Amino acid sequence: MASRPELVGRLLETLLKLASSGETLSVEELAKSALLSKDQVEKILEILGIPSKKVRLSEDLRLEVVLRGLELGVDGSLIARYLSWKEFEKLVARVLGKAGYGSIWNLRISSREGRVQVDVLAYRGDLMLLIDCKRWNKPPAPSEEAKIVEEQERRLRILKSLLEGISESGEGSRAVYLVPVVLSLYQPSKPLMKGHVFSSIGSFKSALDYIERAFFQLRHEKLRVKRGISLDKLVLRLRARL
């Protein structure tokens, strides 16, 4: 019973609200504020990986419990108001790092088509993920999602052109696949739109697994880069170019 998403969400929201000042909280205080029994609170704290004797959230633990709650199905709207944009970025970076991806953030790119900003460019093996992070106050309408796809298409074209220009492709080249992803706290209305992946942060690990298995069925751009150049080096060249 205590592990139901709505109960986990109720306690997590209370915890984020009361622990924002860094104070130590008791199980009794949390139970009273969240309208839960002491046993329920202790069980949920155990699920979230929080010691129940003295409840205090460091920044690192705060991000871990938010991620754990989202993975358990907690509604993102319950906790969105308690997360800064910086904390959302750190959540994304944590998931990417655990999955073995390198990443660079907040790339501002100029081209003949104009300027675009790339929130996250993540890379591992022969995959590069063009990630657009959205911190909506509510789930987006389908029309908003369609507009986001258009914006991602533009970023995709510009980034592909730029990467090919610095990759020294030609004889002895290899393929790298650039895949667009849209990420937010909320579950999207659809996980795919015109081949573009939409994912909540709580489902992001599963989305990464899916992308790695089926990227060739998704919207992607195939790049040719010099064989022997790692994506780390390619990203360094991109940084230098920008």
Predicted region positions:
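Intrinsically disordered, low-complexity Ser/Thr/Pro/Gly-rich regulatory segments
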Residues: 1-118, 122-242
